[in-house]
């Protein structure tokens, strides 16, 4: 078996990626979230496949088909709620994974980091088109509002919106193509994940100390396979508790009302994992400015390798930047809260302050604190 594992063309790839992979001996539980994201992706593809067998992407029957899945299909309610709450677990793991990357300076592995940001964008796109599919009130109006943002692009904006809609409003053509996108995008994500891992294994993993760990590496199996299995066990437990006891806690009650183009919901808002970006979008009065700020709120992550001037790897021995980092996390939580609030005083003002703070921390405060800490080391 050992010979086969090391010599067989297919098994050799798996062996070098998951069995004999040299891994730093001191990586903590924060490094578990990569494997948890892989698990989430598998859960989403499998549950999504079974849902697609019963779903119809037609405006007249989409809402009814989701109700049919929940009522008449064997364990359809479970598959549907695992898929809906699985998306929330996916984004929780994604945010922690990115947060860990920033804290421990993983962005210095720039190829892996940039592919990761492309993955982030693709996952957000998948979640957005997926939210439209049940064809409830929030699905319809969310699709209308977000796709309408493209009309802010000069000259080609309105033409682009109609091209995406497949008509003059969000209708049957839009739903059909969104279903097609939602089906294909997870497989594109899977391809990007392989590229992400390819680049990661070129350089090797980062570790909490931020020091070179070539002198102290251990094989991935059995040490980290067992550790990852424990993480997966906790993830599945959390997901099952969410899906079985609180299936609708993260959803919107408006989505249990069939889509009606003649009746606008009081507060149009996306799923909770988009609220921070939605708050940044709303905090700018100008439409084009808001769209640019929305894009930059994620694209700014690509600036981390460029803005990094620190002589140390990660924040573990850098107390000033540590404080700034935790302020950034708190600021993102404030933005998430504001994104779910109505557009009125004082929420608009808090949103504007939090949006300015978000960009200021990343573009100004972090590079400045890097320089200060470099000078302290010289002393």
Swiss-Prot record:
Give the stretches traversing the membrane. Answer: 33-53, 77-98, 113-133, 178-198, 226-246, 288-308, 320-340, 347-367
Task: Report the cofactor remark.
Answer: Binds 2 heme b groups non-covalently.
Principal localisation: mitochondrion
- Record-annotated residues binding heme b b562? 83, 182
One GO molecular function term of this record is: metal ion binding
Name the positions where heme b b566 binds.
97, 196
What's the domain of life for this entry? Eukaryota
Q: Which InterPro entries match?
A: Cyt_b/b6_C, Cyt_b/b6_C_sf, Cyt_b/b6_N, Cytb/b6-like_sf, Cytochrome_b, Cytochrome_b_C_euk/bac, Cytochrome_b_N_euk/bac, Di-haem_cyt_TM
Regarding the membrane, this protein is recorded as: Multi-pass membrane protein
Further remark:
Heme 1 (or BL or b562) is low-potential and absorbs at about 562 nm, and heme 2 (or BH or b566) is high-potential and absorbs at about 566 nm.
Protein name stated in the entry: Cytochrome b
Q: Which species is the source of this protein?
A: Akodon dayi
Q: What is the lineage of its organism?
A: Eukaryota, Metazoa, Chordata, Craniata, Vertebrata
Q: Which gene encodes it?
A: MT-CYB
